[in-house]
Amino acid sequence: MTSLQQQRVKYGPPHHIKRRPYHPILESLEFQTNQHLIQEYSLDIVNTLSQLESLTLVNPAMIDLQPEIQWFMRPFLLDFLIELHSSFKLQPTTLFLCLNIIDRYCAKRIVFKRHYQLVGCTALWIASKYEDKKSRVPTLKELTIMCRNAYDEEMFVQMEMHILSTLDWSIGHPTLEDCLQLAIDSNNLSNNTTNDIENKSVRPNRKSSISSAVTAVARFLCELSLYDKYFLSVPPSLIAITANLLSCSMLQIPHASITLKNLIEQEIINPQQKKQKKALSSNSSRTTTASYTHQNQSDVRHSSFDEDIDLDSGDEEDDDEDYIDEFYETNNYDDTNATTFDESISKSTTVNDENQPPQIHTPFLSGLDEDSILSIKKICLMLIIQLSKVTEVLSKKYENLGVIQVINNFHSNYKFIIQSIYENQELLLNTINDSTNNNEIDYKLIQSSEILLQFPKFDEYLTEDEDENVSTDDEANSQPQGYDGSGSDGNNQLFTPKSPNAFSSNSSLTLNNHPQSMVPVTPPSATSQYSLFSNKNNRTHESTSGLNSTCNTPTHISISSFAPPQPPPGSILKPKLTSINSTNSLKIKKLTSNSNSSNINIHHGHHNTKQEKRYSHISIGSNSSSKYDGFSPIKSISTNGSLITNNGSLITNNGSFTNIVNNTNSSSPLMNQQQQQQVTQSSLYQHHHQYHQ
């Protein structure tokens, strides 16, 4: 009876119903019909996105004026929003739109520290209403639970109205996901670049697999760009294009590079060639007309004297004056020897060129020019630096998709280039943050970014004769410094140095972890009970690193390949002395007068402070002023099979160190007169021995 009563008591709708998965065939059919309908309005969509991109850009200098919010708080909030986004299974566009709403609001309103998490959750709530379907939108009760009851439901409603009124109810924004899909669609992944003949049934699957892999890696890079301040001042279309190029480079897919090469040739190189041809033709026509006018003037000068005399000058002076006035009114004489051009046409064309907006090409919403290409290379360098600061939340999200393994393989293939970027990290950040020297980036860094992006190569399209005839002063001034690589020669080369063939490397995608790398310190998760943004944590001023988190996500990263580079124990630039049996400290012998060479023997024994002070100018290993000791992407080469270090010391095959005589400073105050004589005698002996040989 009791069991029957319990069964009768259950009223209302059934609970815990398992949702049936949507059929994949129906989903693919809906996607195809949607794409077919969107193609009719593709131009209107791209024009609208380009207008919104210029209107919704955020000025990070305004966020710098916030009294309580600092930039180190941004990773805390972003990790919390990524966890909420993945737990509610929202669309990728929702996360990028949420961050844009937060940045636009913080650039216009003062936000207190205790309300920062409230602004983030409310922005996610607004973005989910704008992008996702109604069943996926989080409720107010769920948001209050996620925030550990730090805010009431009414506070979310009030903050929503305040955000929308601040943004003038304009939420539309070309997110990184939208720009990324435009860039991936322009790759033409359906084109078969191999010579293998494939079945038609296999091609769609191959295309979908390639596009899904490129999308996963590029989306990871786009989400990584949300953490840094620099990417707020860059158009999202250029960030998406750079992420697309870098992901295709990581996956060894040439489609993005080929598409970019065709687009640049079509929109930049070919118009410049046409302009140069017109300039050459106009110069030739001017020279011919100048020669003809010179001949006509010579004929006039050599005419007879009687023809130049007006015999009726006394009778018809008034008529002659009227005729001269009418002649000058009708014919505006120009004394520049027929070398001028029509000013009205030139003014009209220049005015039209200035007033016209930049031409929109499908991935480039802000226009395609040389400045946009340079900014793509700078974004690539900043993304490589940002890869060393990946948080644990982001790495855990993309680890199951295989993105972290692809990045580790990319790091192992381009290890020395990435290390050189890390060594010049401070210089790069200073030049980028400085608005006056924004274009003056190191030539080697630009070249390394081209190699990492697999940037397309361009042949020289100007001959020597054209370079001599065409004056390129205006064009050289318009091109940014440090980009065209022309220097003081003035050659009209469009792009930076020819990078090596991007697809000739025989690198295989193998996982290569480096255990010696440092683990970067990342902020803890924002879902902690004692969150940095909640009211509970404001009572104390304890550091967040010592607080315990209640979330399931660790607070440190497991990606070791993109950590700041550290010298490996068996590096060539820090050699091991195999010929020495002792394990004690190093001791340098004094140079005796009987020595006939400049070899410095290294023995082991106790420390001798006098010897160390005396020979402190001779350093073993790499330069001590370098940030990363022992690491240099460019190795010095010696003809006799030995290796030359950065300080001038020579490492021979038997492991002994010899100091180069020419680099020895004999005038050093640490050397006495006897040692200077020994050095000069040894150098004379070496020259005498080489002369007899």
Curated annotation (Swiss-Prot):
Q: Where is this region: Disordered?
A: 273-320, 465-571, 595-615, 662-693
What biological-process GO terms show up in the record?
cell division; cellular response to neutral pH; filamentous growth; filamentous growth of a population of unicellular organisms in response to biotic stimulus; filamentous growth of a population of unicellular organisms in response to neutral pH; G1/S transition of mitotic cell cycle; hyphal growth; maintenance of cell polarity
Keywords, in A-Z order: Cell cycle, Cell division, Cyclin, Mitosis
Q: Does the keyword Cell division apply?
A: yes
By sequence similarity, the record places it as follows: Belongs to the cyclin family.
Naming one, the record's GO cellular component terms include:
cyclin-dependent protein kinase holoenzyme complex
**Assembly:** Interacts with CDC28. The CDC28-CCN1 complex associates with septin CDC11 upon hyphal induction.
Encoding gene (name):
CCN1
Name under which the protein is recorded: G1/S-specific cyclin CCN1
A GO molecular-function descriptor: protein kinase activity
